[in-house]
Structures are given as structure tokens and as C-alpha cells.
Amino acid sequence: MKFSKRVLLKLKNKNKKLKPNKYKQLKRESLRGLIKGTPERPRLSVFRSNENIYAQIIDDTNSKTLVSCSTLDRDIKLNIQNGRTCDASKLIGQKLAKLSLKKNITKIVFDRGPYLYHGRIKALADGAREGGLQF
């Protein structure tokens, strides 16, 4: 029996039968339908793992990554103790903004993925705003 994505998300809320990874995948796909990056306003995509955080600015119409940054980058890794903190996420946002302004990208669409806008995701967004990106 096949269900639509919306029905599966509702089932998750009602009886908690979906596995967490499947739920994240469905949530990501449902958000992806709403958020698209264009050459004028590319998409800032965020991935958060337990140890690190990764961010990239993507032009979806041409399927190209324009700018990327993570806590594994050498210059950021030297300035932080670990990639799990909000301070590290804020540095990632500021560096991403700096790199994107060099490529004349000022307006973006923020794609938080399946993650809540809280903690490290919010810190990254605040750092990008402080760096000069508008979203």
C-alpha cells in the first residue's frame, strides 16, 4: 500500500510508526518542493551531523554548487575546538556570507532541511545575516 508524503507525515504525528530516517527523508522532500534556488536567489542548504555542520549555496536550475563551507575547512578548524557548537556554526555562516559576496550573491533562500530552526541551524543563519546575506 503506497501513501502520499503528506499522509505519511500525518501518520508519523499520530502513531509514531515511521523510522526516524524515513521521516527525515519525507520531511526534506516535502520542503524541497516548496523551496527552489534560482540564479538570482540561490538556495542555502544546511546539513548537520553530530560532529560537524556543512552549508552550501546551490543554483537548482543549473544544478551547480556555487559556494560551500563546513567545519572541516582548515581555517575554521584551527579557530574552533569542535564542530558541535553554535559558535562554530556562526563562523560557518559568516565565512559562507564572505565567500558568496565575493561571487556577487547577496539574496538567498534558506533551506533548513529536516532540522528545526533552533540552535546550530539558527546560529548559522544569524552568522550569514551578519555577514551580509539577505533572506
UniProtKB/Swiss-Prot annotation:
GO terms for biological process: translation. It is found in: Plastid, Chloroplast. GO terms for molecular function: 5S rRNA binding; structural constituent of ribosome. Coiled coil: none annotated. InterPro entries: Ribosomal_uL18_bac-type (IPR004389), Ribosomal_uL18_bac/euk (IPR005484). The keyword Transport does not apply. Keywords: Chloroplast, Plastid, Ribonucleoprotein, Ribosomal protein, RNA-binding, rRNA-binding. Its main location: plastid. One of its GO terms (cellular component) is ribonucleoprotein complex. It comes from the Eukaryota. Belongs to the universal ribosomal protein uL18 family. Binds 5S rRNA, forms part of the central protuberance of the 50S subunit. Part of the 50S ribosomal subunit; contacts the 5S rRNA. PANTHER family: 39S RIBOSOMAL PROTEIN L18, MITOCHONDRIAL, LARGE RIBOSOMAL SUBUNIT PROTEIN UL18M. This is Large ribosomal subunit protein uL18c. The lineage of its organism: Eukaryota, Sar, Stramenopiles, Ochrophyta, Bacillariophyta. The gene is rpl18.
